[in-house]
Amino acid sequence: MKIVPPKPFFFEAGERAVLLLHGFTGNSADVRMLGRFLESKGYTCHAPIYKGHGVPPEELVHTGPDDWWQDVMNGYEFLKNKGYEKIAVAGLSLGGVFSLKLGYTVPIEGIVTMCAPMYIKSEETMYEGVLEYAREYKKREGKSEEQIEQEMEKFKQTPMKTLKALQELIADVRDHLDLIYAPTFVVQARHDEMINPDSANIIYNEIESPVKQIKWYEQSGHVITLDQEKDQLHEDIYAFLESLDW
């Protein structure tokens, strides 16, 4: 069964725009409900999909953070070209890292980071995550266990330079947190199984933003946008956006 690849989305509403950024191995579906909620509150939302994401995992390994950052910048430019002068950004996981990078690269009204990593995981741990993603993708395609095993063996022979580059990106953004002055809302799931939750404290403590807040979600895991506190998260992000000086 061929999986229909997810698409970027653009929900047009009011003149305030929010760029929504998904995580590594994720896609726009991870931020779609948030996008629909914000649209209902009058915010225009756009979520790009990074190169190599939402497609067979064999394509992921041939892309890297430079490609994905270009997709983020293209998403920002897309909103600018549509006439949106004022743009906020909200990102999940790697998307949160990119949100911070946007914060010291282009004018941004406000930043929401959700479960964004600031600690470097070993390449082995990251690689395990990629293998798990690849296996899950193949299962969703309805392939037999035998075919999946064969394809996974082949997949494991492909070198993944991406992971080293991903580590370097996180380290680089962490080094530049003190260049961020935009209002920032740091969101972190207490039971995050993917990243070190202390990342949230690093972001909160090291950015120079005079207006900043941090909130811990006690019942949520890493993909907080799809977890059981998502409705509360939606309301909190909306309240933060409403507090900005648009």
Curated annotation (Swiss-Prot):
Pfam families: Hydrolase_4
One Gene Ontology term of the molecular function aspect: carboxylesterase activity
Description of pH dependence: Optimum pH is 9.
SUPFAM superfamilies registered for this protein in UniProt: alpha/beta-Hydrolases
Highest taxon of source: Bacteria
EC number per UniProt: 3.1.1.1
UniProt xrefs under Gene3D superfamilies: alpha/beta hydrolase
Enzyme class: hydrolase
Disulfide bonds: none
Entry coiled-coil feature ranges: none
Temperature sensitivity of activity: Optimum temperature is 70 degrees Celsius.
Reaction catalyzed: a carboxylic ester + H2O = an alcohol + a carboxylate + H(+)
Membership in a protein family: Belongs to the lipase/esterase LIP3/BchO family.
Oligomer and partners: Homodimer.
General function of this protein: Involved in the detoxification of xenobiotics. Shows maximal activity with C6 substrates, with gradually decreasing activity from C8 to C12 substrates. No activity for higher chain length substrates acids rather than long-chain ones.
Protein name: Carboxylesterase
Species in which this protein is naturally found: Geobacillus stearothermophilus
Protein encoded by which gene: est
